Amino acid sequence: MKAFDKEELTIIRKFEHIEHCLKRNVQAHVSNGFEDVHFVHMSLPEIDKDEIDLSVEFLGRKFDYPIMIAGMTGGTKGSQLAGKINKTLAKAAQELNIPMGVGSQRAMIRKPETWESYYVRDVAPDVFLVGNLGAPQFAETMPDRYGIEEALKAVETIQADALAIHMNPLQESVQPEGDTQYRGVLKALAELKAEFPYPIIAKETGAGVSMEVAIRLESIGIDAIDVGGLGGTSWSGVEYYRAKDELGRNLALKFWDWGIKTAISVAEVRYATELPIIATGGMRDGIAMAKALAMGATFAGVALPLLRPAVKGDVEGVIKVLERYIEEIRNTMFLVGARNVEELRKVPLVITGFTREWLEQRIDLPVYLRDRRI
């Protein structure tokens, strides 16, 4: 049997991740918390639905809709599948003028021949594109740790506009071949940010960002946070199906629903920082997306619902899903009397249940609802 090197194993793992997301139920067993967030219906909205403006500004660019296609893949075995997915998503993003990310580029850094699986400029010359590297690769205890050279390579090889640094300690801790080196990551990111000429987005992958972490990230100049909250795809769940033995399966199962729910994470980050927020994590309809926007997010990020049509190369299928979300956001805004996203952040919200209980212990909830969502 052939012995694979670490980079080849990374490429194989990316393929397995796509396969499990498509073929198995890898959703969290708990919600993302937005069922506890309620709009107050306005019987007299005092606006026309067709005057609603869904555009938003982010990192110096204006976008037509407050939705982002979250990074999913790249560098898979053979690379053709990842390339097909990314190009399909990019065509949809280009058509709708919304941003998109690519999956982790670790495979590309070590195996440059996989670069084409991330490259979409030939089909989406204008799309705001976000590259993607993992936080552990910048840790002081990581052999061959990354620095500005690798960060520049990730962005410039694919002509991206920004770089996401994904923080995924949960997934790494339950992954058979996971990288659990995180010592010195914040310092390394501060050093990178000081000389890196592109915006940096700190991104979680399903366990959420707390206000403590958000404050640290803001203090070193990070440009935006993708909260990547609990309630959508569970990467511990994905690793459960990849586990090689009973010990690994048990660990992944126990931590399947670990993390901070997306709604809670949005509230904490908005309360504690001034950073732009991308709300990903179980965003499966436009009403929940509108709630995230009302809570202070700039974008709602979506991944898994777009994967199935993207695997087929079905650009229209991807656009159809996104247009459904867009219409649901627009209709929600009409029913609360919000002409634009800025006004949506000022409409009354009622927070109940577990989400309220959590937030009352963590932040000044009345102050957040009254003053901190803008």
Curated annotation (Swiss-Prot):
Keywords: Cytoplasm, Flavoprotein, FMN, Isomerase, Isoprene biosynthesis, Magnesium, Metal-binding, NADP. The keyword Ribonucleoprotein does not apply. It is found in: Cytoplasm. It holds the Pfam family FMN_dh. It catalyses: isopentenyl diphosphate = dimethylallyl diphosphate. GO terms for biological process: isoprenoid biosynthetic process. Its cofactor is FMN; NADPH; Mg(2+). Its EC number is 5.3.3.2. One of its GO terms (molecular function) is isopentenyl-diphosphate delta-isomerase activity. Signal peptide: none annotated. SMART domains: IMPDH (SM01240). FMN binds at residues 71-73, 104, 132, 203, 233, 282-284, 303-304. Substrate binds at residues 13-14, 104-106, 171. Coiled coil: none annotated. GO terms for cellular component: cytoplasm. Mg(2+) binds at residue 172. Homooctamer. Dimer of tetramers. Involved in the biosynthesis of isoprenoids. Catalyzes the 1,3-allylic rearrangement of the homoallylic substrate isopentenyl (IPP) to its allylic isomer, dimethylallyl diphosphate (DMAPP). Belongs to the IPP isomerase type 2 family. This is Isopentenyl-diphosphate delta-isomerase. The gene is fni.
